[in-house]
Amino acid sequence: MNADLTVVSPQIQAQILAEALPYIRKFHGKTIVVKYGGNAMTEERLKHGFARDVILLKLVGMNPVVVHGGGPQIDNALKKIGKQGTFVQGMRITDEETMEVVEWVLGGEVQQDIVMLINHYGGQAVGLTGKDGGLIRAKKMQMPDKEHPGQFLDIGFVGDIEAINPAVVKALQDDAFIPIISPIGFGDDGQAYNINADVVAGKIAEILKAEKLIMMTNIAGVQDKQGNLLTDLSAREIDEMFEDGTISGGMLPKISSALDAAKSGVNTVHIIDGRIEHSLLLEVLTEQAFGTMIRSH
């Protein structure tokens, strides 16, 4: 289905809207948490389409909450100061200098770009970091050393979430704003921590009792070792894929967070291809199934 209403006939436009009606009714008043990342954040056409999609969800009565990443933008900023990004088990090693770059890029450049685009198209977006309203309290991550059981790797200012205070997000939702959250947490001493955006999105969805968690990525969904798309995954199947190495690298925190959200009561969890224009609307407002659904059982 072509979701761009500017290039189809009035009859097809009416058909699309009619198909969306049951979903608009079903999800009216519900919270939809979207992890926004990948090409959808870097390609101009997709960026503008995403902004319009989020506004439409808000206008028809849903409560979208956006948690954004920014890995490519951080890498580009680090290159400008002669640093190379390094990852362990899908997590970015974050020394003091890198943490300063992460704060500036995520909480400044990337977040403001999203906010300005949504506001440009008539929405009301407000940017938040974990420090705002005490939204994300974090502590230094203790990452197990897989090669030395019982020991831990020091990966710098990478954080684990200790607590989420949803009050500021709920207040914005009640006032018709769209929260745009940067995945930066803060410790009790004020230290900033870099937190994986997938982890933040999953925990936000859990705390807000979201109807849906949608993770946008650069692939069609979760794939097996032969590259075949897996449209539906249970907790047991995911555990097996962790064990045999099918899921690795940056997909580790993504799938773990998706599964945790499903187990914690988020009704539906999907990993979708953000390279498809209007993929967010297709997921929420049509019968068209694509990507991978994560199930807790």
Swiss-Prot record:
<dbReference type="GO" id="GO:0042450">
    <property type="term" value="P:arginine biosynthetic process via ornithine"/>
</dbReference>
<keyword id="KW-0808">Transferase</keyword>
<dbReference type="InterPro" id="IPR037528">
    <property type="entry name" value="ArgB"/>
</dbReference>
<keyword id="KW-0028">Amino-acid biosynthesis</keyword>
<keyword id="KW-0963">Cytoplasm</keyword>
<dbReference type="GO" id="GO:0005524">
    <property type="term" value="F:ATP binding"/>
</dbReference>
<keyword id="KW-0055">Arginine biosynthesis</keyword>
<comment type="function">
    <text>Catalyzes the ATP-dependent phosphorylation of N-acetyl-L-glutamate.</text>
</comment>
<keyword id="KW-0418">Kinase</keyword>
<comment type="similarity">
    <text>Belongs to the acetylglutamate kinase family. ArgB subfamily.</text>
</comment>
<comment type="pathway">
    <text>Amino-acid biosynthesis; L-arginine biosynthesis; N(2)-acetyl-L-ornithine from L-glutamate: step 2/4.</text>
</comment>
<dbReference type="GO" id="GO:0005737">
    <property type="term" value="C:cytoplasm"/>
</dbReference>
<dbReference type="InterPro" id="IPR036393">
    <property type="entry name" value="AceGlu_kinase-like_sf"/>
</dbReference>
<dbReference type="InterPro" id="IPR041727">
    <property type="entry name" value="NAGK-C"/>
</dbReference>
<keyword id="KW-0067">ATP-binding</keyword>
<dbReference type="Pfam" id="PF00696">
    <property type="entry name" value="AA_kinase"/>
</dbReference>
<feature type="binding site">
    <location>
        <position position="92"/>
    </location>
    <ligand>
        <name>substrate</name>
    </ligand>
</feature>
<dbReference type="GO" id="GO:0003991">
    <property type="term" value="F:acetylglutamate kinase activity"/>
</dbReference>
<dbReference type="GO" id="GO:0006526">
    <property type="term" value="P:L-arginine biosynthetic process"/>
</dbReference>
<feature type="site" description="Transition state stabilizer">
    <location>
        <position position="254"/>
    </location>
</feature>
<feature type="binding site">
    <location>
        <position position="194"/>
    </location>
    <ligand>
        <name>substrate</name>
    </ligand>
</feature>
<protein>
    <recommendedName>
        <fullName>Acetylglutamate kinase</fullName>
        <ecNumber>2.7.2.8</ecNumber>
    </recommendedName>
</protein>
<feature type="binding site">
    <location>
        <begin position="70"/>
        <end position="71"/>
    </location>
    <ligand>
        <name>substrate</name>
    </ligand>
</feature>
<dbReference type="InterPro" id="IPR001057">
    <property type="entry name" value="Glu/AcGlu_kinase"/>
</dbReference>
<feature type="site" description="Transition state stabilizer">
    <location>
        <position position="35"/>
    </location>
</feature>
<dbReference type="InterPro" id="IPR004662">
    <property type="entry name" value="AcgluKinase_fam"/>
</dbReference>
<dbReference type="InterPro" id="IPR001048">
    <property type="entry name" value="Asp/Glu/Uridylate_kinase"/>
</dbReference>
<keyword id="KW-0547">Nucleotide-binding</keyword>
